[in-house]
UniProtKB/Swiss-Prot annotation:
Residues 29-43, 109-125, 202-232, 280-308 are cytoplasmic. Keywords: G-protein coupled receptor, Glycoprotein, Membrane, Receptor, Sensory transduction, Taste, Transducer, Transmembrane, Transmembrane helix. One of its GO terms (cellular component) is membrane. Putative taste receptor which may play a role in the perception of bitterness. Residues 1-7, 65-87, 147-180, 254-258 are extracellular. Belongs to the G-protein coupled receptor T2R family. It is found in: Membrane. Glycans are attached at N80, N161, N175. It holds the Pfam family TAS2R. This is Taste receptor type 2 member 107.
Amino acid sequence: MLNSAEGILLCVVTSEAVLGVLGDTYIALFNCMDYAKNKKLSKIGFILIGLAISRIGVVWIIILQGYIQVFFPHMLTSGNITEYITYIWVFLNHLSVWFVTNLNILYFLKIANFSNSVFLWLKRRVNAVFIFLSGCLLTSWLLCFPQMTKILQNSKMHQRNTSWVHQRKNYFLINQSVTNLGIFFFIIVSLITCFLLIVFLWRHVRQMHSDVSGFRDHSTKVHVKAMKFLISFMVFFILHFVGLSIEVLCFILPQNKLLFITGLTATCLYPCGHSIIVILGNKQLKQASLKALQQLKCCETKGNFRVK
């Protein structure tokens, strides 16, 4: 049974997951409908569709594993459920982080303007950057899956051994380290590009700060808003992996459901928060969402009149 604090946090986690799935579903559907209408898909549209779909899968895996750990922990130590969850998690989590890294790089190369020769070279070769990152993703999968299979097979072989109970936690840590090794590169690249874009926008805002004309004042507000979105993304992104680390530690520490659910809460903030950031930061997505909300409000008003 859960105490009141654990129950409240679990409700928060579930709400975050539902909002994240709804937000990503909306992003994916909007871009798919835009592609069906215009018969053309931009790089950003492709990345947003891939990011939304992969992140929906990641959220479901996080919630599934979280609920199993809270209510049915014995299921993770018996049968093949751990193996299935691990394989799906590695595939979807790597893919999700890869898509968000591509999105950050694309915005960075599109918006920022540095005189650095490396930056200028990258800006002229955006497609080459995507190909390189695709190669990194495939390499990450090729390195992770064989090693992960070996670890899981060793775990199965020793599971009936009584001494294995004490070693299982060490194997679990090794397993988690190996399966997440491939995404460290993408995480670092994503955070660096966000930080550099924030630096560029901050310098640009500071340069325009002395000019208070209408256009420049509006441009400054847009830049400040973009900086807030980027900082929010970085906070959510870091909290996501901090939460995952807490969840991993809870498998080797004495059982502490409150700490584990706290980790889940931090983990689910990113998919929920970033989907909202993407919707608010994209003009077309924002306008379409506002129209949808207005239509829902009108339908609700008409329904109230009919009841009366």
